[in-house]
């Protein structure tokens, strides 16, 4: 390893970046798990799966709202984030997933079969696709929020 590479120290571009990157996976996992429990409910008709979906969607929305706030702060504060890196695509996909899941939460409050089949499951599928698309934008640019300084002499 060359000397210049060994001396580089990664620095976070802003204070909200680590918060967002820690919070972002939680709603994605909750939304995917809600889709899985919707599929389980449609296959078994056990009311337990409907209640699992409700709780997973609620948890995803609560943590997702915190992540969305951190993303908005970072997005508005950093021109580099808006023009490159994550960009508008990530923002639209993540906020879209949250909006779809908000509607899905209201649909899931209906008791019984109609809460999931077909509307609730359709909304869960759409939200899962949007959330996975937002995850995909993170890997498009692998070092979005990390900047390297030149070594001090």
Explain the meaning of each model-derived region.
Residues 1-28:
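Cytosolic juxtamembrane helix and N-cap/initiation of the first transmembrane helix
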Residues 16-24, 42-63, 86-90:
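Transmembrane alpha-helix entry/boundary detector in multi-pass membrane proteins
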Residues 145-153:
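Short, highly charged, low-complexity non-transmembrane loops/tails of multi-pass membrane proteins
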Residues 129-146:
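Membrane-water interface at the C-terminal end of transmembrane alpha helices
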Residues 32, 39, 69-72, 102, ...:
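Hydrophobic residues within the alpha-helical transmembrane core of Major Facilitator Superfamily
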Residues 63-77:
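Canonical alpha-helical transmembrane segments
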Residues 102-122:
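Membrane-helix boundary connector in multi-pass membrane proteins
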Residues 73-95:
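Loop-to-transmembrane helix junctions at the membrane interface
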């Amino acid at each position: 390893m060359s000397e210049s590479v060994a001396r580089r120290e990664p620095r976070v571009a802003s204070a909200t970046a680590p918060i967002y990157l820690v919070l972002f996976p939680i709603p994605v996992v909750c939304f995917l798990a809600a889709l899985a429990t919707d599929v389980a409910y449609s296959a078994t008709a056990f009311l337990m799966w409907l209640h699992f979906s409700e709780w997973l969607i609620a948890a995803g929305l609560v943590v997702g709202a915190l992540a969305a706030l951190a993303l908005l702060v970072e997005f508005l504060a950093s021109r580099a984030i808006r023009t490159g890196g994550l960009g508008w695509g990530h923002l639209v996909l993540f906020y879209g997933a949250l909006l779809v899941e908000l509607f899905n939460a209201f649909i899931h409050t209906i008791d019984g079969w109609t809460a999931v089949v077909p509307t609730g499951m359709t909304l869960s599928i759409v939200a899962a696709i949007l959330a996975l698309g937002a995850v995909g934008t993170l890997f498009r640019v692998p070092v979005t929020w990390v900047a390297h300084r030149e070594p001090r002499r």
